[in-house]
Amino acid sequence: MELGPLSDIASEPGVTDIAVTCDGTVWADRGQGMRPHALRVPFSGPQAIRDFAVRLCSQLGRRLDDACPIADASTVEGVRVHAVIAPLVPQGAAISIRLPDVVAPSLESLAENGMFPSGWMPLLEGFVERRASVLVTGGTGAGKTTLLKAMLMRCAPGERVITVEEVRELGMLNHANHVSLVTRGANMEGKGAIGLSQLICATLRMRPDRIVVGECRGGEIVDLLRALNSGHRGGMTTLHANQVTAVPSRLVALGLLAELNPQAT
């Protein structure tokens, strides 16, 4: 993927996120929060930012224009691009890019970096080996997807892993028998959309050993629960929740979106 003026900062070790605001300011997160970054050749103006955003999305097969002013796109490797153009922003475009780890995360490296106590290692490994259903929760930027991917790396090589995502963030796993499914938006006529719920249902006919949903944010939680309760063990997903105590209410809220009785969750 060609990142143009952002190529240098994107290639720096430790950079996880890059953002471009509509005034042309570039921000980068090197693990300590967003900090401004000076480009060697800055954007010349709002139109240059917009043109750059359109080119980024076009590379990844997504439209970004007056008819479709918001775009989400990703590469097979897990680089994620989100862009919004004027008039939804004051001028130009607002661009957000999330970069995957250059080296696939491992549970050992995450423990060494302080994501969780080293004493949790046997517990997490046991979840994978016993094919337990796993729900990874946390706030924005907490590393939910990173931990999920590290756990998937512990799956037996022969397992058939089906991943379902709105935007491909997990990237390609080290499994020969891995299928990565992503949703599709509607076309100009408002037809052809394929959502998470449809994809989860499709996985049931794909002989999965594990069904993995990148993140549950809506009624698709019901389809995943049905899959896990129908004999498909070892499923995994993530859920946004700032505190563990908020998880039950979040699950109930998502279930209500699919008209599920609160007692069922």
Question: Which residues make up each language-model segment?
Answer:
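N-terminal anchoring/assembly modules that precede and organize ATP-driven motor systems
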Residues: M1-A38
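Active-site phosphate-binding and catalytic loops of NTP-dependent enzymes
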Residues: E2-D8, L56-A73, E159, A258-A264
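Generic beta-strand/beta-sheet core signal
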Residues: T21, D29, R98, T137-G139, ...
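P-loop NTP-binding catalytic core
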Residues: T25-R130
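P-loop (Walker A) phosphate-binding loop of NTP-binding proteins
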Residues: F127, G139-T140
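Switch/coupling sub-region of P-loop NTPases
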Residues: R131-V134, A150-T265
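Conserved lysine of the Walker
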Residues: K144
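Hydrophobic positions on the alpha1 helix immediately C-terminal to the Walker A/P-loop
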Residues: L147
